[in-house]
């Protein structure tokens, strides 16, 4: 579906902008009728960059992705895989 692609691409773009190894950024998506689960995988060296101090970057990423999904009537969950 087009909306999920937009949300996935948004998360991928944001993550690649934050890390030192953008070639290692991967986003896997799983969807149901109302929810999209996005699993973000980055290089081990970059995990701290996408989580941030006290999880602030991760929280910001989740907020942006959720806002984008809600606009299209879906719920988005971002999981950072280590």
Descriptions of predicted regions:
Residues 1-49, 60-82:
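RNA-contacting regions in translation and RNA-metabolism proteins
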């Amino acid at each position: 579906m087009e909306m999920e692609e937009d949300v996935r691409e948004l998360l991928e773009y944001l993550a690649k902008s934050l890390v030192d190894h953008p070639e290692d950024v991967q986003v896997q998506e799983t969807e149901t009728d109302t929810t999209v689960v996005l699993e973000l995988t980055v290089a081990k060296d970059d995990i701290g960059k996408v989580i941030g101090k006290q999880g602030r970057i991760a929280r910001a990423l989740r907020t942006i992705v959720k806002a984008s999904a809600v606009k299209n009537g879906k719920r988005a969950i971002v999981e950072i895989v280590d």
